[in-house]
Each structure stands twice: as structure tokens, then as C-alpha cells.
């Protein structure tokens, strides 16, 4: 459960995003635990010290009592509002936001065929990384991708801003591309039972 300042706009059984973006140095250090940021390793858009810790959790509301909101499933991340508020780069402390989405979307029993570069080079060009990206699953809950073959694609599928999505019984073949299935800014995504039969360079073999 979380307590919000005003729960009047929230409804039972609706989906919301529990989110934070904060670059308080103490908060960044807590998030990284024993890890350290290597100067120059990432570009400015991915600098956690500048842009802050970003957390997005997607939840369905089970009950609302006053301003206390309880979700159907446990919260994954500690919600600590004691760190100072970060006000730069459009950031914010913990808050609950409405989450427009689609539900019960299934994609199955299909083949997606592309023609990605034979001499793939990681981040070599836009053609290497993304010329053939047939499928994206965005803002979905309780949805799935199964029994699908991806042939010679740059990136098979990205699951973004989604929750409770399953991806399984997937085959990759043909020419090897940039990536297969990835989950980004999502909660509770299962990716399993995938088989890679593609041919081509490995990431560490340019």
C-alpha cells in the first residue's frame, strides 16, 4: 500500500503507474548499492547522476481507503520519500499516475520476415540496429506473444511501458540482427522458451 496526498482521481480496479525520478546523490548511491558510474561510459541522456534514478511500476488498484491505495500485487521497489525532491529535467519524487493502456492483446502463430544486414555491426548504423523491427508491444497489460518466428530481423520485439506480458515459444532464424526480445520500462514481463537459430556475427566479434 501507498498513501497519496489526494486519491479522489483514482478508482478501484484501475491501472496506475507508481513512479519516481530523483537525482539526490544519496538516493542514487542507495540505488546503485556497491556499483559505481564510470565517467564517460554512457552519454548524457543516460547519466544517472544528472538525470536521476527512474522507477516505473505498473499496478492495478485493489482498494482505496481514504488516501491509502492498496494494489493487488506487492510493490517491487522501496518507496522512500525522505530524499530531497529533485526539480530539474522534469523530475519528481514518488507519485501515482493514471495509466492509459490496452488489455488482453495476443499475437500468435505468425512469422515475421525481414532482410537485415548480413555483416551486422553492433551500433554500426541505423540499418545495423533497426532497419527491420516488425513488432512493438506498448502500454499493454495481461497480454502475450507466443508461437512466433522471426527471420532475419534487426530487433524482433520490444515490450515497453507494459505489465503482465508473457513472451514464449519464439524462434529466431535467418541472419542475426541487433537484438531479439527486450523488456523496457515495464513490470512483470516473462520471456522464456526462446530458440536462437540465427547465423552471423556475435556482438564481441565485429
Language-model-detected regions and their locations in the chain:
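Exposed loop/turn and edge beta-strand positions of beta-sandwich/beta-sheet ligand-binding modules
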Residues: 55, 101, 131, 139, ...
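Small/polar beta-strand repeat architecture
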Residues: 1, 7-8, 27-121, 128
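Right-handed parallel beta-helix
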Residues: 103-114, 141-152, 163-177, 185-206
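Aromatic-lined, polymer-binding surfaces characteristic
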Residues: 156-160
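Short, surface-exposed secondary-structure boundary micro-motifs
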Residues: 21-22, 74
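Extracellular beta-strand/beta-solenoid scaffold signature
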Residues: 84-98, 121-136, 152-155, 174-183, ...
Amino acid at each position: 500500500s501507498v498513501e497519496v496526498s489526494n486519491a479522489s482521481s483514482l478508482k478501484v480496479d484501475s491501472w496506475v503507474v507508481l513512479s519516481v525520478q530523483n537525482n539526490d546523490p544519496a538516493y542514487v548511491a542507495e540505488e546503485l548499492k556497491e556499483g559505481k558510474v564510470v565517467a564517460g561510459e554512457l552519454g548524457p541522456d543516460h547519466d544517472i547522476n544528472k538525470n536521476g534514478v527512474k522507477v516505473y511500476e505498473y499496478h492495478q488498484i485493489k482498494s482505496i481507503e481514504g488516501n491509502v491505495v492498496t494494489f493487488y500485487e506487492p510493490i517491487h521497489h522501496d518507496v522512500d520519500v525522505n530524499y530531497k525532491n529533485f526539480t530539474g529535467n522534469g523530475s519528481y519524487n514518488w507519485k501515482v499516475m493514471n495509466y492509459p493502456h490496452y488489455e488482453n492483446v495476443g499475437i500468435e502463430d505468425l512469422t515475421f520476415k525481414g532482410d537485415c544486414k548480413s555483416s551486422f555491426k553492433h551500433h554500426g548504423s541505423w540499418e545495423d540496429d533497426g532497419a527491420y523491427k516488425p513488432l512493438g508491444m506498448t502500454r499493454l497489460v495481461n497480454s502475450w506473444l507466443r508461437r512466433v518466428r522471426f527471420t532475419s530481423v534487426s530487433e524482433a520485439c520490444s515490450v515497453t511501458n507494459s505489465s503482465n506480458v508473457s513472451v514464449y515459444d519464439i524462434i529466431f532464424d535467418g541472419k542475426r540482427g541487433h537484438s531479439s526480445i527486450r523488456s523496457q520500462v515495464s513490470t512483470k514481463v516473462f520471456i522464456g522458451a526462446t530458440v536462437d537459430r540465427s547465423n552471423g556475427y556475435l556482438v564481441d566479434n565485429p
